[in-house]
């Protein structure tokens, strides 16, 4: 595939990632069939473009991680077919997209530079997501709509891409906006993810980007800023009469809003399953379709437990191995002070929290923008940024690699140099 065509497909896929978030936010606001149709069409179009991009790119551009992700997709499809759980089109909307997106961006970033337009697309897309999240948050004061609030998680899911492509001032502005939106949503998991993720991002960012003589001062400023933000947050909570603190304090006493009961029922069903289904699983979304919790169909609210029931212990081990690869890559980037280490560090919070208390690997929703970031960061780290062989070559490659920043980033650097 020619360079221009590959870049065009990349841009179209990146735009579709935002379109998927837009349509998802609108669908859960009023459950309109039109928005659901547009959402499904966007996801299927995204998957088709990623598959075509991978097929036409040639085998030489594919790395171990991308092949592993594709193997995981085939495993999901095979198990689902054998267990008569090959649900069309939902299996191609929920199960297939996120590994394929991860693999596509990983392979692309290994051998290609990213177009500068992705920064502008990120700002426009993030603006739209934050604006569309406002009515989803406000609706909770009139009717109970958990899906509408869950869709607002796209706000923090796109933050690592914002940090990756945009200037610090723009990133800081959107970070404050996302923290405020998640605070108003009263969603405990979202609040923990944003606060913890931003804190970890800040710490790693200082370690990676600051000289050793300035690092201690920057750490002190981060802690001081965190304390000030906490005080202002408490004042805002009291002023607006929000009960987020009460909900955080009750995160264990209320059984995770009924999650522990759901987990117990699923584990009982898993224990009663035949050995082959324990090892290889019951198939796509079997928890939703086969396990009745409280007489209604629902997911496990635990991505790892959901994966174990749907795809067995073997499938769970594959997901855990992938998580270990991501954690290992993050630690390597931090050790080598790689430019994308802070974004990878941020992503550990949504991956960890949502995997044990919500939805993550079983649905291609909130995970999609995070997979884009993982693919770009890990692909560039293992590919064109590290053309030389060996650990010494890798370190040298990371120091020699030059990144062309956006105009706003260039102006910031000039101001820092002049200061």
Report residues per predicted region:
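Transmembrane signal-anchor hairpin modules in multi-pass inner-membrane enzymes, especially those
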Residues: 1-77, 166-169, 381-419
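Flexible juxtamembrane loops connecting transmembrane helices in multi-pass membrane enzymes
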Residues: 213-218, 231-265, 289-291
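Aromatic-anchored transmembrane helix interface
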Residues: 36-45, 63-78, 84-107, 126, ...
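Transmembrane alpha-helices of multi-pass inner-membrane enzymes
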Residues: 344-356, 360-407, 419
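Hydrophobic alpha-helical segments of polytopic membrane proteins
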Residues: 2, 11-12, 159-238, 317, ...
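Alpha-helical transmembrane segments of multi-pass inner-membrane proteins
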Residues: 98-140, 146-207
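Hydrophobic transmembrane alpha-helices and their immediate junctions
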Residues: 3-7, 57, 313-352, 385, ...
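Long extracytoplasmic/lumenal interhelical loops at the membrane interface
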Residues: 253-311, 321
């Amino acid at each position: 595939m020619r360079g221009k065509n590959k870049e065009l497909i990349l841009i179209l896929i990146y735009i579709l990632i935002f379109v998927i978030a837009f349509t998802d936010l609108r669908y859960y606001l009023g459950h309109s069939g039109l928005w659901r149709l547009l959402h499904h069409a966007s996801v299927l179009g995204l998957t088709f473009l990623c598959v075509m991009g991978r097929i036409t790119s040639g085998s030489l551009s594919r790395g171990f991680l991308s092949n592993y992700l594709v193997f995981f997709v085939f495993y999901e499809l095979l198990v689902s077919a054998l267990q008569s759980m090959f649900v069309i089109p939902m299996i191609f909307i929920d199960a297939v997209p996120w590994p394929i997106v991860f693999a596509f961006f990983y392979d692309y970033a290994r051998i290609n530079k990213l177009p500068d337009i992705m920064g502008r697309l990120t700002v426009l897309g993030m603006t739209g997501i934050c604006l569309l999240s406002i009515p989803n948050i406000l609706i909770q004061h009139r009717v109970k709509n958990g899906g509408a609030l869950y869709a607002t998680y796209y706000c923090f899911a796109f933050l690592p891409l914002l940090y990756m492509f945009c200037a610090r001032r723009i990133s800081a502005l959107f970070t404050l906006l996302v923290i405020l939106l998640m605070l108003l949503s009263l969603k405990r998991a979202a609040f923990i993810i944003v606060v913890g993720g931003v804190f970890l991002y800040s710490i790693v960012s200082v370690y990676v980007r600051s000289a050793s003589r300035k690092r201690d001062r920057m750490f002190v400023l981060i802690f001081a800023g965190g304390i000030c933000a906490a005080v202002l947050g408490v004042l805002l909570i009291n002023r607006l009469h929000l009960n987020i603190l009460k909900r955080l304090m009750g995160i264990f006493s209320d059984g995770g809003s009924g999650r522990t009961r759901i987990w117990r029922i699923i584990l009982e069903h898993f224990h009663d399953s035949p050995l082959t289904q324990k090892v290889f699983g019951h198939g796509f979304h079997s928890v939703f379709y086969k396990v009745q919790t409280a007489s209604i169909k629902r997911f496990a609210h635990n991505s790892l437990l959901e994966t174990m029931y749907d795809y067995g212990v073997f499938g769970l081990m594959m997901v855990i191995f992938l998580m270990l690869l991501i954690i290992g890559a993050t630690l390597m980037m931090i050790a080598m002070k790689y430019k994308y280490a802070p974004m990878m560090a941020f992503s550990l919070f949504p991956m960890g929290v949502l995997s044990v208390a919500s939805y993550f690997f079983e649905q291609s929703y909130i995970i999609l923008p995070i997979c884009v970031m993982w693919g770009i960061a890990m692909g560039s780290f293992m590919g064109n940024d590290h053309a030389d062989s060996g650990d010494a070559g890798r370190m040298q490659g990371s120091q020699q690699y030059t990144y062309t920043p956006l105009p706003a980033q260039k102006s910031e650097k000039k101001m820092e140099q002049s200061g």
